[in-house]
Amino acid sequence: MVQGKFKVLDSDIHIIEPPDLWPRYIDPAFRDRAPIGLTEDEGDLRLAYNGKGWGRVAIDADRSRRRQGRNYALNQERWRPYAERGWTSKVQLEAMDIEGIDVAVVYPSRGLFALTIPDMDPPLAAAMARAYNDWLHDFCQENPERSEERRVGKECRSRWSPYH
């Protein structure tokens, strides 16, 4: 993958977290309050929390943009195979290979909204950040031989408990 003498770095690669990330990874004491990812569109980034939706759908999946052209349908088809495979770490590594990317800094997508839910109490926010970080660690272990040098996960931090 190395292009000449240089490695190709994607400094801002995003993953789409599984809808059940927080129920699966959060401390059991918070499991009944954990948000769940919504999946109405191929790139749905929203969360359900306390019976309400939070976040937004991916830009290309934004329903208000459907009338503005064909991009919505094209992108739904483009991303469908990845969504059907669960946006897994293996899928991410394949995409990096297709694009010729050697190293990537991995950022959240759905996780960007997780800690912005209004009125979330600090202990829950800290538990959600830990759950995301635990999941991200597992995500980056798909191929341990490549993970150390190929992907760096950008951890999630709760603003109320940034070091936990």
Give the positions of each predicted feature.
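Helix-coil boundary/capping segments in enzymes
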Residues: 1-157
